[in-house]
Amino acid sequence: VPIITHCEDTPMIDAELARHRERYGDDIPARLHPDIRSREACIRSTRLALDLARRHGTRLHVLHISTADELELFEAGPLVDPDGKVRKRITAETCIHFLRFAREDYDRLGHKIKCNPAIKEASDRDALRQAIAGDVIDVLATDHAPHTLREKETPYVRAPSGLPLVQFAL
């Protein structure tokens, strides 16, 4: 049975959120979401999870990969050998929104694309697309979160994370 985990370093995120709240209060600009839920928070947590899984021989599935740097931590190749034997003990998933949007889209869409982990750079988006073709990403998910437009239009600290994306699974 695999362990399934969402990897972000909470103390790093909490420190960045506190720093931004000092400056902006509750109305932090949406474009700063990738600074609060940073690439470093993702990489550190993902690296730790993979190190522990490898050390203990644990099957691990990491959810919501959002950076090119995280991709480098995973093995490329098919999930199973031609004889049907499981080849990968550690697998990765990314979400549709990480393949569609990039950091600059926060300026136009604001909290409508606020999700955890945050959408990162265009270069990360491009690397994730390539990772699907290269058998590094094993699962593509929606991470469906049916928040209303009214909820998404609230100030940063009240605007929920997640996007309503179930339609892409159909």
Please identify what each model-predicted range represents.
Residues R150-A159:
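Basic, amphipathic juxtamembrane/active-site segments
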Residues V1-L140:
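Histidine/acidic residue-rich metal-binding segments in metalloenzymes
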